[in-house]
């Protein structure tokens, strides 16, 4: 390969919505409001899961980790996006881009595994209620959560290292809001077939396998619910699973759109960021973390009771 034109990039420029200047102020206001909701909503869920003894169960331990994950993910990306929207400062350092890519990929991978663990937890609770305390004891659910975080971190380390090691031939303009891995790989002037293969393997491990766990868990749950004679029992089982299932549909719907389409199609796409792609990216990165605590607090009686208890206790203390 001709190496004359290859130069090391010291920083990147994130185009974002620069092609739609009238939308930038609107997006700034929307993202800012949603970020505040994310911090408050997920923060309340974390505090409630720690302080309220009624939530000291595996499901709420997973939920607390999911809320913490959403805060970490959005905090690694939203503040810089807000700054670029309001100040027109669109440059990000090479190391800053790598850090942003790492956290985004790590949090996404971890969330896939966490959602799978939560589905398995619901399967054991509904299909094997008598053995639930034995199967899902504290050692088990803490270990499952630790594996989720560790595997997500390892996957992100591998993908980020492979993506950032290529020469970029002086081309440093990223057609995205963030240092998203596919957008960065478009700038590489080397053969990225290794990245495509590793991303495909990652998709199988972190998208397909957890989704299979979720699918079969809910098949067994549905079978058990339909066999239940008690209408109250069926309603309780459905209400317990509905929040998680809603989050799964929203999360996997957006992430499959972004990462499960053919890589050649994505990497050879148009130079300008499509409006639909930008909206889906924002939905995945901002709207989904905002909806998670809202969905769980609206659908789950225990969470609603815990939040009301915390708010009432705070009002009394004041």
Curated annotation (Swiss-Prot):
Record-linked CDD domains: 7tmA_OR13-like
Membrane found in the keyword field: yes
Localization terms from the record: Cell membrane
GO biological-process terms attached to the record: detection of chemical stimulus involved in sensory perception of smell
Stretches assigned to the Extracellular side: 1-25, 76-99, 161-197, 259-277
UniProt-recorded Gene Ontology molecular function terms: G protein-coupled receptor activity; olfactory receptor activity
Keyword line: Cell membrane, Disulfide bond, G-protein coupled receptor, Glycoprotein, Membrane, Olfaction, Receptor, Sensory transduction, Transducer, Transmembrane, Transmembrane helix
Xref: Gene3D superfamilies: Rhodopsin 7-helix transmembrane proteins
Segments on the Cytoplasmic side according to the record's topology features: 47-54, 121-139, 218-237, 299-318
Biological role stated in the UniProt entry: Odorant receptor.
Protein known as: Olfactory receptor 13C4
Organism: Homo sapiens (Human)
Chain's gene name: OR13C4
């Amino acid at each position: 390969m001709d190496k004359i034109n290859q130069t090391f990039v010291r920083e990147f420029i994130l185009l974002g919505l620069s092609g739609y200047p009238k939308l930038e102020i609107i997006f700034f206001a929307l993202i800012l409001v949603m970020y505040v909701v994310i911090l408050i909503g997920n923060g309340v869920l974390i505090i409630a899961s720690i302080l309220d003894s009624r939530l000291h169960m595996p499901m709420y331990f997973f939920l607390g980790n999911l809320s913490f994950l959403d805060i970490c993910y959005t905090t690694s990306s939203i503040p810089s996006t807000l700054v670029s929207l309001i100040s027109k400062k669109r440059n990000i350092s090479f190391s800053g881009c790598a850090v942003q890519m790492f956290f985004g990929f790590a949090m996404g991978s971890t969330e896939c595994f966490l959602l799978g663990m939560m589905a398995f937890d619901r399967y054991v609770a509904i299909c094997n209620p008598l053995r639930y305390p034995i199967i899902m004891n504290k050692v088990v659910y803490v270990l499952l959560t630790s594996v989720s975080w560790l595997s997500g971190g390892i996957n992100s380390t591998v993908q980020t290292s492979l993506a950032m090691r290529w020469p970029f031939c002086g081309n440093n303009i990223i057609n995205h809001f963030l240092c998203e891995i596919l957008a960065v790989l478009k700038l590489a002037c080397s053969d990225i077939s290794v990245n495509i293969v590793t991303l495909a393997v990652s998709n199988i491990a972190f998208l397909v396998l957890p989704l299979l766990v979720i699918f079969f868990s809910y098949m067994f749950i549905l079978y058990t619910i339909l066999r239940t004679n008690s209408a109250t029992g069926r309603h309780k089982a459905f209400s317990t699973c509905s929040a998680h299932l809603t989050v799964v549909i929203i999360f996997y719907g957006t992430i499959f759109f972004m990462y499960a389409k053919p890589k050649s199609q994505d990497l050879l796409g148009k130079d300008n960021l499509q409006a639909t792609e930008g909206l889906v990216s924002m939905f995945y990165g901002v709207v989904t973390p905002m909806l998670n605590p809202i969905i769980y607090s609206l659908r789950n009686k225990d969470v609603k009771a815990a939040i009301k208890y915390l708010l009432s206790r705070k009002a009394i203390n004041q």
